[in-house]
Amino acid sequence: MTNFFDILSERKGQLFSTMIEHIQISFIALLIATAIAVPLGILLTKTKTISEIVMNIAAILQTIPSLALLGLMIPLFGIGRVPAIIALVVYALLPILRNTYTGIKEVDPSLIEAAKGIGMKPFRRLTKVELPIAMPVIMAGVRTAMVLIIGTATLAALIGAGGLGDLILLGIDRNNASLILLGAIPAALLAIIFDLILRFMAKLSYKKLLMTLGVIVMIIILAIAIPMFAQKGDKITLAGKLGSEPSIITNMYKILIEEETKNTVEVKDGMGKTAFLFNALKSDDIDGYLEFTGTVLGELTKEPLKSKEEKKVYEQAKQSLEKKYQMTMLKPMKYNNTYALAVKRDFAKQHNIRTIGDLNKVKDQLKPGFTLEFNDRPDGYKAVQKAYNLNLDNIRTMEPKLRYQAINKGNINLIDAYSTDAELKQYDMVVLKDDKHVFPPYQGAPLFKESFLKKHPEIKKPLNKLENKISDEDMQMMNYKVTVKNEDPYTVAKDYLKAKGLIK
C-alpha cells in the first residue's frame, strides 16, 4: 500500500492528464452514440420489420471482442483517438438504441390519441408527449452505455489513444501492481461517478435535462478545442514497442533531439508490437520508432539474410526499407538484442544443457512458454524448429512479462528472451548458445520515412550520436533499473547520456 501511494505521488501529473484523456474519449463516444441511436430508435418505432433487423445488427456488433474491433479499426483509420472513439461508439449503440425504441413503444397509446385529438402534429407529439415520457428509459440506456464505454476505453491505450489504459498497460509491462491499480481504480470511480450524475439527470424535468445536456456539450467542445489551439509549432512523435528497453531508447532520442534542435518530441510508450508500430509509421500516425535490423529483414521486408555479420545485416535492412517502403534507418547502436532461448540455471545444471541443440535430449520434459510474436515469426520458433529439428508440444503463448513470472513459478521451464532482458539477471536464467546461428543480429536504430527526414534533416546528427554506443551490459543494466527497481525510463536515459558525455 505504501508503494501505491509513492507511485501516486510520483505520477499524479500523469494520472491527471490520462484521466482527462479518458473522460474526453468517453464523452465524445457517448455523445456520438446518443446522437445516432436516439433518432434511429425513434425511426425504428415506425416499422417493426426493419427494427428487428437493425437491433440484431447492433447486437452482433456488440458481440465482437473489443480487442478485435480495435484491431479492425487500424487499417481503416490508423491509430489514435479516432479509431478508439469509433469502436466505443459501436459498443454503446445497442443499449441506447434498444432503450429508445422500448421507451417510445411503451408510451400509453391513449396519451398519443389524446395528443392527436387536440391537433398535435407528429413532431410536436414526439417532443411534447413521447420523448418526455420515454426519457427515464432512454437515460437508463445512456447510463448503461456510459459505464460500458468507460470500462472499454482502457483498451484504447493499445492503439495510442491515451487514457487510463496507459497506466494499466505500463503496470502490466513493468509487472507493477501499483501502476495497474493507479489506472484501474480511477477508471472504476469514473464509471460510478458518471453513473450517479446521469441518474440525477434522469430525474430532471425534460426542459432542464435538455439545458443540462447543452451545457455539457459546450464544455466538452471547449475542452477539446482549447488544447488544439494551444498547441504551437511542429511536434515530432516517437513511439516505442512494449517493454522497458524501447521506452529508455525512445526517451534518449527525445532528449538528444530537444537538446540540439528546436523541435518538441512526444514519446508514446508501449504502443504495441512490431506490425502495429510499422503500420502506424506507414500511415503517418507516428514519425519514427526504434526498430531492429533482424526484425526488418525477418518480419517487415521478409528478405533472406545474405550474411550474419552485423554491419552487412544493417546495410541490407537499410537498403531493403529504402527500396520497398521509402523508409530508412539511421546509424545502429552497439548492443545486439537478439532472440534467445533461456532456462532456469538449476534446470540447465540438472540436465547439462548448454546449447539449443541440447534441448532435444530433454524434449519430453520441456514446458515451453513463448511470446505470440516469437512463436509466429519466421525468424523465431519456426527458424529454431527447422534448424534444430526441435518440435515442441503444448507451447503456451503469453505476453512478454508474464512468461518470466510463469517460469519463476514453475508453470513453464523454457522461454524465448531478448539477450538484454533484465529478467535474465533477476530470475537467474541461462541463455542457451545458438550453436547453429539461427538468430540474426538485432541492432537497434531509429526508423523514419525518408520524406520525414527531408523535412527534419536536423535530427540526424543528434540521433547518430548513439552510433556504436550502449553495450549489451549497459542495456541490460538500464533495463534492470526500470523493470526491477522501478526507476523512471526518462531519468535512466538521461543519466546514461550524461555519463557518456552525449549531453551537457
Curated annotation (Swiss-Prot):
The transmembrane domain (TMD) and the solute-binding domain (SBD) are fused. SBD binds to ergothioneine. This is Probable ergothioneine transporter EgtUBC. The complex is probably composed of at least an ATP-binding protein (EgtUA) and a transmembrane protein (EgtUBC). One of its GO terms (cellular component) is ATP-binding cassette (ABC) transporter complex. Keywords: Hydrolase, Ion transport, Membrane, Nickel, Nickel transport, Transmembrane, Transmembrane helix, Transport. It comes from Staphylococcus aureus (strain USA300). In the N-terminal section; belongs to the binding-protein-dependent transport system permease family. The chain crosses the membrane at residues 25-45, 49-69, 70-90, 145-165, 178-198, 209-229. Part of an ABC transporter complex EgtU required for the uptake of ergothioneine (EGT), a natural low-molecular weight (LMW) thiol antioxidant. Responsible for the translocation of the substrate across the membrane. Also contains a C-terminal periplasmic solute-binding domain (SBD) which binds to EGT with sub-micromolar affinity. Probably does not bind L-hercynine. It is a multi-pass membrane protein. It is found in: Membrane. It holds the Pfam family OpuAC.
